[in-house]
Amino acid sequence: EYLNKIESGKMKPSKELLEILHKELARFNPEAPLTMLFDYVKIRFPTLDIQHIIKDILKLNINYMLHEDYGHYSYTEHYSLGDIFIYTSADEEKGVLLELKGRGCRQFESYLLAQQRGWYDFLMDALVDGGVMKRIDLAINDHTGILDIPELAEKCRKREYIGKSRSYKFYQSGELIKHREDDREYMGRTLYLGSLKSDVYFCIYEKDYEQYVKLGTPLEEADIINRFEIRLRNERAYYAVRDLLTYYDAEQTAFSIINQYVRFVDEEPDKRKNDWKLNDRWAWFIGDNRQSLKLTTKPEPYTLDRTLRWVQRQVAPTLKMLKKIDKGNGTDYMETIEQ
């Protein structure tokens, strides 16, 4: 009778009921509630031939790249194209290091698309060339609010989770994690599962809040509500890539890692903890009654932002000086450059 009154418009459902209905309807959304992306890729190549890596592995043109006589991670120089970075030095043990952060991954996907290649093709080329996986991050985007980060944090506090590591950290504000994240001022409530010093840990945060702070996108209009990042280093990164290239099944690779390290349960006082029922929301997230998850791409074009910053920093001061010399001495250095 209560539902009939709501359906006929004689009664308005409560705010709490509307939230429940929206969440349940999201289960039947024809669009996949979850998508997955590469969000960080760092590979070291045991060679000093940076031109070979850029031309034959990345399949990019080194002539279009910016070159700088400094680097990070104790490398002495680097080449960049937008947010794609390749570091090198004279130290043979260091070799050549490729680093793609979030935007770098999106920009590189544009080049992969133009090359009629995909991530699997690139990773296979990298491994065949002796590439050493230093870090791989897989980001699972939650588009419908499957995950409830405060609820997961509370379950961690109450020890209602089973995993290899009991270590967790929950932050209400991104300001508290400024020494760990590049986008720390944008991240909303954030939960880390596992030791941050280990080769495997997870980071779950409110992506809709990040987009609100960064772009002003209203929370209710955000395409991605939460993001679950699987962060892998060294050997663990290698085994994940090997698994991807063996089975070509991103969902299997991602959730086999998650299930191996953590699962959230609901307390049942009369049972052993290992026999507690899997939490319904968590069960849905890891694959119970939802559409399958596939590796997706979200290519973004290269922008001139970084190039313009480089021109302002490296070139503009010299041009300004030449203009003054031309004006004072009657020379035509600027005209020669423009030709």
Per-segment meaning from a language model:
Residues 1, 19, 302:
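Residues within the helices of the helix-turn-helix
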Residues 1-13:
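Recognition helix of helix-turn-helix/homeodomain-like DNA-binding domains
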Residues 10, 21, 311-314:
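DNA major-groove recognition helices of helix-turn-helix
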Residues 12-15, 92-94:
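Generic alpha-helical scaffold signal
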Residues 14-29:
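DNA major-groove recognition helix of helix-turn-helix/homeodomain DNA-binding modules
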Residues 27-302, 307-339:
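Structured, helix-rich domain cores that form ligand/interaction pockets
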